[in-house]
From Swiss-Prot:
May help in the organization of the PsaL subunit. InterPro entries: PSI_PsaI, PSI_PsaI_sf. This is Photosystem I reaction center subunit VIII. It is found in: Plastid, Chloroplast thylakoid membrane. Belongs to the PsaI family. The chain crosses the membrane at residues 10-30. It is a single-pass membrane protein. Its main location: plastid. Disulfide bonds: none annotated. Pfam families: PSI_8 (PF00796). The keyword Chloroplast applies. Keywords: Chloroplast, Membrane, Photosynthesis, Photosystem I, Plastid, Thylakoid, Transmembrane, Transmembrane helix. One of its GO terms (cellular component) is photosystem I.
Length: 36
């Protein structure tokens, strides 16, 4: 019962979390480039 429910919860979580992590890494890269 857990296996079919897991992707239903995991896919939207990754869909929201992945762009957030990408934005954070991009912001840190811009900030680091600005310091240099």
């Amino acid at each position: 019962m857990i296996i079919p429910n897991l992707p239903s919860f995991f896919v939207p979580l990754v869909g929201l979390l992945l762009p957030a992590i990408t934005m954070v890494i991009f912001h840190l890269y811009i900030q680091n480039d600005d310091i240099f």
